[in-house]
């Protein structure tokens, strides 16, 4: 079997100007980045606002193994299959972060015969969105330090600056640093640190903004620090929201590319789902809905993280809620949740599938709480056996959830046809009646307890001393009506990554809250979730190279 990059490089790409015509986009509506990439103009996005939105399909997954369960691959294959059925379909996906590409994950543009192209460009610098977000974030850091140096009129306490610098790489050495050393002309010495770019609040803001005006307002609402008397300092106090918006004026435009089968794809934004809200941009999803009859989108990691945040945080900013939710499951992950060691996952084990099914069952029940129809997609792997597949299908039938085997990695659109037909049938037969899990009027404490008990299956929430103080402070600042974005391990329903399956009778501890007032949510920190990842012992970068003719090598 060819590698992902070999498959991608064997495809004869169509000019993006031809691809976008399939959904009514003309050459004048796009800004080209070479022959195969483009950005969509503000004028076109404005022109389609009055269009009736099409059907929205959200792809999510069970709690993943470290390798992931193939949500992006399944999303791409499902969109290709829908187009093959004659349904005008678009993709709306996140763009990869360079850090994980160079680290543990390799490429992140789908896999096998379900990929978005040109995958090398998408995985590396793409159209420069990540660089623009990094620059805007670090410009703000520089402006904060300059304010301290130039007299500090706002009375910012250097010990209480919460805005960090960012880099789109995995670099553990930069998690905690000291800046301003050397001499008085080098600034005010203080503790600082770096996050990965996709953890920046500016990434979340870009993905939730509805236009340039909204982007500017959200940037102005960012809290960067506290004064000596513990009052919040906003970007608007520094009067630099205009400059930050200027840096991001092109990055806010969604990117257009294509799949192997020529399906138009909007790929834009990429916040992580374990430390942010894990969804692509509102602009990309909204525009796809108004251009196509079916839009396929995804939310990061398992349904307890990405899908919960999609439904509670992103949907209120969209023209509509999902018409169906597809939960991707793999037999290897179910066996891992059933107690099988990673080294033994290739061996047939139907009993482990039965035990691990508890994880999938809880995700199905959770998504049904939102009153949206659910379909299970089994992402087929070579090691899967007929007995294991039959076991999983029978278990799905017991809880009356439609289930289909999909082999889009190996067979592309054809491998997703059964799933696509089932999804269309479910949408036609069962109307969604979206219901949000909590109200904005609930307190932050109530929202957290709701998520932990209703989605995670936990018994109770313990708030650490700092979190308890912040609950009171944030209410005084007027932030208590914002949604909650939980920062939690992706591997478990709990805050313990080794607690697999569907655990019950556990507590989750919130050690502190982080205000993301520009994005419009409050992050609740649990466990030891890192906002700047490190590299593994053998980084994926070690297998990468470039040929003399410029062709990328070893990129997954």
Swiss-Prot record:
Query: Which reaction does this chain catalyze?
Result: (6S)-5,6,7,8-tetrahydrofolate + formate + ATP = (6R)-10-formyltetrahydrofolate + ADP + phosphate
Organism, as annotated: Streptococcus pyogenes serotype M2 (strain MGAS10270)
- ATP-binding found in the keyword field: yes
- Name the Enzyme Commission number(s) assigned to this protein: 6.3.4.3
Q: In which pathway does it act?
A: One-carbon metabolism; tetrahydrofolate interconversion
> Which residues are recorded as binding ATP?
65-72
Question: Gene that codes for this?
Answer: fhs1
- Name of the protein this chain belongs to: Formate--tetrahydrofolate ligase 1
GO MF annotation, one: formate-tetrahydrofolate ligase activity
The UniProt entry, under Pfam families, shows: FTHFS
**Which protein family is it in?**
Belongs to the formate--tetrahydrofolate ligase family.
UniProt cross-references to InterPro entries, sorted A to Z: Formate_THF_ligase, Formate_THF_ligase_CS, P-loop_NTPase
């Amino acid at each position: 079997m060819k590698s992902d990059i070999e498959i991608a490089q064997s495809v004869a790409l169509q000019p993006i100007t031809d691809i976008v015509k399939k959904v009514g986009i003309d050459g004048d509506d796009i800004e080209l980045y070479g022959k195969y990439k483009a950005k969509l103009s503000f004028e076109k996005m404005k022109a389609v606002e009055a269009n009736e939105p099409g059907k929205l399909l959200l792809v999510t997954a069970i709690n993943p193994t470290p390798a992931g369960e193939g949500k992006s691959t399944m999303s791409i294959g499902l969109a290709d299959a829908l187009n093959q059925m004659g349904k005008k379909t678009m993709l709306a996906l996140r763009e990869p972060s360079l850090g994980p590409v160079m680290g543990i994950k390799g490429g992140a543009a789908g896999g096998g015969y379900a990929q978005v192209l040109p995958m090398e460009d998408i995985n590396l610098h793409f159209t420069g969105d990540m660089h623009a977000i990094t620059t805007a974030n670090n410009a703000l850091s520089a402006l904060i330090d300059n304010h301290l140096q130039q007299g500090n009129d706002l009375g910012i306490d250097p010990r209480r600056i919460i805005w960090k610098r960012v880099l789109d790489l995995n670099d553990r050495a930069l998690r905690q640093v000291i800046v301003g050393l050397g001499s008085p002309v080098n600034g005010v010495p203080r503790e600082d640190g770096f996050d990965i770019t996709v953890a920046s609040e500016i990434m979340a803001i870009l993905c939730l903004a509805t236009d340039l005006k909204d982007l500017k307002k959200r940037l102005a609402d960012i809290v960067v620090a506290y004064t000596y008397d513990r009052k919040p300092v906003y970007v608007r106090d520094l009067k630099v929201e205009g400059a930050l918006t200027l840096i991001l004026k092109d990055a806010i435009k969604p990117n257009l590319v294509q799949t192997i089968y020529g399906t138009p794809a909007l790929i834009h934004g990429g916040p992580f789902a374990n430390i942010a809200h894990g969804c692509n941009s509102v602009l990309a999803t909204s525009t796809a809905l108004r251009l196509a009859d079916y839009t396929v989108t995804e939310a990061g990691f398992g349904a307890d993280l990405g899908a919960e945040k999609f439904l509670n945080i992103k949907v209120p900013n969209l023209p509509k809620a999902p018409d169906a939710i597809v939960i991707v499951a793999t037999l290897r992950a179910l066996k891992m949740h059933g107690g099988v060691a990673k080294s033994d996952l290739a061996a047939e084990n139907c009993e482990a599938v039965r035990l691990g099914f508890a994880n999938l069952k809880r995700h199905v029940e959770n998504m049904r709480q939102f009153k949206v129809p659910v379909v299970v997609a089994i992402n087929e792997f070579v090691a899967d056996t007929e007995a294991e597949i039959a076991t999983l299908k029978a278990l799905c039938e017991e809880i009356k959830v439609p289930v289909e085997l999909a082999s889009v990695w190996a067979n592309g659109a054809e491998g997703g046809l059964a799933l696509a037909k089932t999804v269309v049938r479910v949408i036609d037969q069962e109307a969604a009646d979206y219901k949000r899990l909590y109200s904005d009027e609930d307190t932050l404490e109530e929202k957290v307890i709701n998520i932990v008990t209703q989605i995670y299956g936990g018994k109770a929430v313990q708030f650490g001393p700092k979190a308890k103080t912040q609950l009171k402070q944030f209410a005084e600042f007027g932030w208590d009506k914002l949604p909650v974005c939980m920062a939690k391990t992706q591997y478990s329903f709990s805050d313990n990554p080794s607690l697999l399956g569907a655990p019950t009778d556990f507590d989750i501890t919130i050690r502190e809250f982080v205000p993301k007032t520009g994005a419009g949510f409050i992050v609740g920190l649990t466990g030891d979730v890192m906002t700047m990842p490190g590299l593994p012992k053998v980084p994926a970068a070690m297998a990468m190279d470039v040929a003399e003719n410029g062709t990328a090598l070893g990129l997954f």
